[in-house]
Amino acid sequence: MDLFECINVADAHQKLQEKEAVLVDIRDPQSFAMGHAVQAFHLTNDTLGAFMRDNDFDTPVMVMCYHGNSSKGAAQYLLQQGYDVVYSIDGGFEAWQRQFPAEVAYGA
């Protein structure tokens, strides 16, 4: 895959439930602490190395941001780092929180 794909929150949720992909959240630490998808890994410049070390490059990665815009650049970056399949989640955390309010965690 040379380009990331966009995915809606319902499809992202299904992939996560079926363990077909991992979810990363690239929002700032304060926003992440105020609420994030339960299974999201907080991906920052500081945690990128650990994420890459702990996740196989053939494991699909779904990238979440605020509204689905910033995640596109991060998704492309992860492809350039060698990940085979990367998705940008349309609507970002705001759409996730609206559609799956029971699956939002709080704190870092």
Swiss-Prot record:
Entry-linked PROSITE patterns: RHODANESE_3
Sample GO molecular function, one term: thiosulfate-cyanide sulfurtransferase activity
Gene Ontology BP terms: glycerol metabolic process
Domain Rhodanese intervals: 17-105
Record's GO cellular component terms: cytoplasm
Pfam families: Rhodanese
Presence of the UniProt keyword Ubl conjugation in the record: no
Job of this protein: Transferase that catalyzes the transfer of sulfur from thiosulfate to thiophilic acceptors such as cyanide or dithiols. May function in a CysM-independent thiosulfate assimilation pathway by catalyzing the conversion of thiosulfate to sulfite, which can then be used for L-cysteine biosynthesis.
UniProt cross-references to NCBIfam families, sorted A to Z: PRK00162.1 (NF001195)
Similarity field: Belongs to the GlpE family.
Protein name per UniProt: Thiosulfate sulfurtransferase GlpE
Organism: Shigella boydii serotype 18 (strain CDC 3083-94 / BS512)
Lineage: Bacteria, Pseudomonadati, Pseudomonadota, Gammaproteobacteria, Enterobacterales
